[in-house]
Each structure stands twice: as structure tokens, then as C-alpha cells.
């Protein structure tokens, strides 16, 4: 069966469901596809199709994730749903499924639970910019005051982790009713309200090509008579011949000019996000540039050595460590294209970190890396991956 061509007529947004186990994330995911497919086209997915999420590997870590797609009047959405709590932790930290916004599912019958809190914290740490709340199972709560109380609790919890709790859209409904075809305001009505909230509350994400130019350096060659060529894949933005660029990371920042862009042995006037290119640098010596640095628009990204991060430590079964690690553990941190050694400082209340844990840490690298909050990295020991992380806050 031929795959239908992906029509990119509507802007594309990535979302996902988060929240405590059994609060109805997967049922809601099924309900959204069912209601929206009948209204705007697309494919309805049954609960068990989503629940049997296939295994994927991201940075060597096995994650179960279900991917569904749906459309609203204005947009095309790609939506991820994970069966288990551990899958969420891994997914959010590795950035396997980058989210432009999340739908936090909270059971009105139970209120916020430990994983509700943990997922909000994770969303904050890994830089999920927007959260919309679906207050599920409202058909099981007769008491309007109780509903108000749960809503208030959720808003307070969001505010506690620096999300705008007072302004967050909270949609009351029942995913089960909607999935069963109930046309009332808790059923289909709630799903349509949720779709509207997604469209209006989550802004259309900036496309990679619109960002400030950034390219991780993969290789450096000198071509006699022409100068130094740096190769890599443009991560974001556009580079045009004649533009100034900076070389950032590992060594003091250098300024240079792009004098040529090559792709598949052809000369171009520009390279853009997604292109694998060679960039010719004016007056730069071969030994002044190395793998692990980045080429970027001047002033757009700075080198840092000291930061806090949220990390997931691989379990033994995933090929990770067999033993815990302690304060001042010094592994390699693999950023983009290179390893840099760094020392880990654990939180005051944590004596050690076990394989399979996730934890907030502070890291000091021995050499600076071009860094922004939200940058992903792997933690390695002798070339094998033992963890994955994301920069939460830059200290210096």
C-alpha cells in the first residue's frame, strides 16, 4: 500500500501527553484522533493500537513511544504517548520526541499525584515551553466544588515549577465518553475545546531555518591555494557567502568570514538548516578549528563550562553501568560531535546515583562548549554511553 504524500499545507507542531499512570493519557490520545479524524480528516487510532507502543532507540536507550498524527482546522500535529513512567523520563531527557507543548492529563477523581508533579518538573527541566491541562474523568465527580479544588491544586503545582498556572488552559472532560462517541460537553465537546486550546495557546514553533546560523564542526581539511574547509550539517539558520561567522568552543572564540559553501562538490551561495556542507573560511589555519566546536552567527551562542542538567542513567540491561556513581564522578560528556571530561556534583540529599535513575546534577567541564539551555548530551565512559542528559541552566 502506497503511503499518501505528506501535505505540508498547514504548520506542523509536536505535542505529547504527560501525567500520572492511569489518569487516562492513552485514552485521551485515542479520543483526540477519533474525534478530530471525523471532523478534519486523518486516521482514528484505537486504544490498543496506541498502548502497544513500539520500541525505539534514542542515543542507545530503548524507549517505548507511540506516535499518532491529527489535524485541526489550522494545524497538523504529531503527538507522542508513552506507556510507562520510565519511558517518559527517557523520552523527555533524550529529546527523542521534542515537544513544542504538552498536554498534562490529571484525573479529576484523584487530583495531582507524584508523577503529575514529576512530569511537570521534567517539562520545566528539559524546556517544554507550554503545558495545557486536560482534567479527565470529570464524569466520575458529581461535586462541582471538588472539581474546583482539583483545578486549583493543578494551577498551584504548575506555578510552583514556573509555568503560568493562572493562565494555563484547563479543559474539563472525559476521554472515555469522547471515545465512546458521547456528543456532550464532557465528551466530544471537551476534545474540540482541547484542540482549540492547542491551536491558540501553543505558538507555531520557529522553523530551524529561521534560527541564528549554527553548524557543529565534524571535520576540518586544508585545501592548498583555497584555505581551510570545515564540514558538518547545518543545525539551524542560513549561511551565505561573505557573511561573518564565529568559531566557538574548546578554545578562545575566533571571528572569520565564510568565503564559500560547497555541497556534493558543487559551489553554492548559501547553506541552510539540514544541509550537509563544506564551509570555506577566510584566513583561518587548519589547526585553529577542530571537531566539537561550532560555526555560528557572531554573538548568537557562547562557550560555557558550568551548568545544571537533568540526566537519565542507563540501567545495566540497557548496557549502562552495573554499579552506582558518587559525587565528583568524572565521565565524558558528548556534546554534538565530541567528548569533554567533566566532574559531576550531586544534589545535597543524594549520596549516589543508581543505574536506571534520573537526577538533577551540576557539571563542570574541563573545556568550554558552545551551549544553550535545552542542549542534549550523552554521558560516556571509554566510548560507551552510560547516560543521557539535557542542559537545564547555565551557571557560567
From Swiss-Prot:
Quickly give the catalysed reaction.
Answer: GTP + H2O = GDP + phosphate + H(+)
Q: Where is the tr-type G domain positioned along the sequence?
A: 10-206
The UniProt annotation puts the region (G3) at 81-84
Stored Pfam families:
GTP_EFTU, GTP_EFTU_D2, GTP_EFTU_D3
Where does it reside? Answer: Cytoplasm
Q: Which residues bind GTP?
A: 19-26, 81-85, 136-139
Which segments carry the region annotation G2?
60-64
Q: Where is this region: G1?
A: 19-26
Q: Where is this region: G5?
A: 174-176
Q: Which UniProt keywords apply?
A: Cytoplasm, Elongation factor, GTP-binding, Hydrolase, Magnesium, Metal-binding, Nucleotide-binding, Protein biosynthesis
- Principal localisation: cytoplasm
Q: What domain of life? A: Bacteria
What InterPro entries does this protein's entry cite?
EF-Tu_GTP-bd, EF-Tu_GTPase, EFTu-like_2, EFTU_2, G_TR_CS, P-loop_NTPase, Small_GTP-bd, T_Tr_GTP-bd_dom
Q: Which GO terms describe its molecular function?
A: GTP binding; GTPase activity; guanosine tetraphosphate binding; translation elongation factor activity
Which EC number(s) does the record attach to this protein? 3.6.5.3
* Binding residues annotated for Mg(2+), in chain numbering: 26
Region feature G4, mapped onto this chain: 136-139
User: A Gene Ontology CC term for this entry?
Assistant: cytosol
Record's signal peptide:
none
The similarity annotation says: Belongs to the TRAFAC class translation factor GTPase superfamily. Classic translation factor GTPase family. EF-Tu/EF-1A subfamily.
Its subunit composition reads: Monomer.
Record's function text = GTP hydrolase that promotes the GTP-dependent binding of aminoacyl-tRNA to the A-site of ribosomes during protein biosynthesis.
Q: Which NCBIfam families does the entry mention? A: EF-Tu, PRK00049.1, PRK12735.1, PRK12736.1, small_GTP
Protein name per Swiss-Prot or TrEMBL: Elongation factor Tu
Q: Which gene encodes it?
A: tuf
